[in-house]
Design a protein with these regions (language model features):
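Surface-exposed coil/turn segments at beta-strand junctions on protein surfaces, enriched
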Residues: 26, 73-75, 105-107
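Tryptophan-paired
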Residues: 46-91
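C-terminal motif of bacterial Sec signal peptides marking the signal peptidase cleavage site
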Residues: 15-18
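Beta-strand-rich cores of mature extracytoplasmic or soluble domains
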Residues: 86-175
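Bacterial N-terminal signal peptides that target proteins for export
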Residues: 1-9
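Short coil/turn motif common to extracellular beta-sandwich-like domains
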Residues: 26-33
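Structural motif
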Residues: 33-42
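Bacterial signal peptide processing site
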Residues: 20-22
C-alpha cells in the first residue's frame, strides 16, 4: 500500500511539472516609469498607474518611479493597462480612465514613458532615450509638453471646487 501511494504521488508530480514545462515563462525586467502630460493648461493628470504600479502625477517627464516589469523581448500584442485621473482645474471636475494600451516596439527595455496626448490618445514607449528637450532620436511622440501650473492660474481646488465629489468614470475595462 505504501509503495502504491509513493508511486501515485510521483506520477502526480510528473504530470504537474509536465503541464508547466510546456509553458515558456516570459523573462521580465524592471523599468523606470514616467508620465508625460501633453494636455491643455487647465487639465492635468494628477495620478496614473500602469499594471497597478502608481506613477503618481504625470508632468514634463522629469519625475521617475520605480518600477514596472516589461518583457526582455518585445512581442506583437504586448499591452499594459493604464489608468489615470484628469483634473479640470478651470471647471472643477475630474475624470477617471482605464484603458489597455499597446506598448510600442522596442529593441531593449528602457524607461517606460506614458504619454497622455491632447487628443485623448495614450502612447506607451520603452526607451533609453529621454523625450525631453525636443530629442529627435526619441521614438515616441514629439507633441508639445506644456509647462503649466494650473493651481496658480485657476486658483487652488478648495474652497473653489466641491469637496468629496466623485469622478466621472469616462472609460473602464470593466464596461
Amino acid at each position: 500500500m505504501k509503495t502504491l501511494l509513493i508511486n501515485c504521488a510521483a506520477a502526480l508530480c510528473l504530470l504537474l511539472t509536465g503541464c508547466d514545462a510546456g509553458q515558456a515563462r516570459e523573462e521580465t525586467i524592471p523599468a523606470p516609469l514616467t508620465g508625460i502630460d501633453h494636455l491643455a493648461d487647465h487639465l492635468s493628470v494628477q495620478e496614473f498607474w500602469v499594471n497597478g504600479t502608481s506613477g503618481h502625477q504625470a508632468g514634463g517627464g522629469g519625475s521617475v518611479v520605480c518600477c514596472v516589469k516589461l518583457p526582455q523581448q518585445w512581442h506583437s500584442g504586448l499591452t499594459v493597462v493604464v489608468g489615470w485621473g484628469v483634473t479640470n482645474w478651470r471647471d472643477c471636475t475630474w475624470e477617471s480612465h482605464e484603458r489597455r494600451v499597446p506598448v510600442e516596439r522596442y529593441d531593449e527595455v528602457g524607461s517606460l514613458y506614458v504619454h497622455f496626448l491632447s487628443d485623448g490618445r495614450v502612447r506607451v514607449v520603452s526607451s533609453n532615450i529621454s523625450p525631453g528637450y525636443s530629442n529627435e532620436d526619441y521614438a515616441g511622440p514629439h507633441d508639445p509638453i506644456p509647462s503649466k501650473t494650473p493651481y496658480e492660474k485657476y486658483g487652488t481646488w478648495s474652497p473653489r471646487c466641491p469637496v468629496g465629489a466623485k469622478p466621472v468614470l469616462t472609460e473602464s475595462l470593466d464596461e
